[in-house]
Amino acid sequence: MPCEDGPVAKDERSKRSAAEAIAEAKVHAPTRGNKKLDKFLEAVNDDEQVRTWWYMAQMTSERLGMSDHSWVHVQVILNVALRLLRLLDKAGVEPAMVTDHGMKLRDAEVVVAGGALFHDVGMSIHRKDHEEFSLFLAADRLPELLADVYKEPSRTIVASETLNTIIGHRRRGEPYTVEGGVVRVADALDMAQGRSRIPFEGGQYGIHALSAAAIDEVRIEQGEERPVRIEIEMNNSAGVFQVDDLLATKLRGTPIEDKVEIVAQVKGETEKRLLPSFRVE
């Protein structure tokens, strides 16, 4: 699922102050009349500390030469996660908020939104073990951000389930819920053209960057054999590594593993030449 807004180039961003960059960090998603989700997103967008964490997460990714981890990445994951959850619900797959707590789909939407919004805030501190850092940052802010949305004990239930989605998105994470699986898979789907190829265009020619540059488009549709069908269009078969090493790994072992079908194919008759040569130093 492509995003209309792309990350701001580093040289362009450097012309602005940190305050200006943080001020523009506002996320949007189709709430479909979910007033709880509306209130939660409004609270997050109004929270300068959260938006500063997004700014600092991107700073860390730039220092390491990684793909975009700014608020744009957050917005992509937010929208993808909501789409996945709604497609699963349409097929009769109930989230934990419904099956375990007797709540509603709209509450599950708040949980996956929270997971998407906070899953990488720990990157503002350090890349290594950032999921754990995200946990303690989110644990401090979530209750306050949810204060106008839920009363106790619902507020703590929503916050706890959100924290489960955050820790579950790490590479060897074990999400116990549909919501956790949704956030984990959504995080791997920010790979459309202009997104994961950033390290490649920066001169990094390893297999991760090369395979990322091979991904042109990602489509998330209602499936026929399974509730969700993810179609990935590639310009080069090197993209298979990105699909299998990143996406398939994120999907395996989650409660939605058997609910999602992944199909990747190279478009056209010929493959795009991604680099002229490769030299091992």
Language-model segment annotations:
Residues 127-140:
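Post-HEXXH active-site segment of zinc metalloproteases
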Residues 2-45, 63-68, 79-106, 118, ...:
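Divalent metal-dependent phosphate-bond-processing catalytic cores, especially two-metal-ion Mg2+/Mn2+ enzymes
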Residues 111-115:
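Active-site alpha-helix of zinc metalloproteases
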Residues 151-159:
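Membrane-interface starts of transmembrane alpha-helices
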Residues 122:
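Catalytic acidic motif of RecA-like/P-loop NTPases
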Residues 158-161, 167-170:
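An acidic, phosphate/nucleotide-engaging active-site surface
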Residues 45-56:
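N-terminal glycine-rich anion-binding loops that anchor highly charged ligand groups
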Residues 56-76:
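N-terminal low-complexity or amphipathic/hydrophobic leaders
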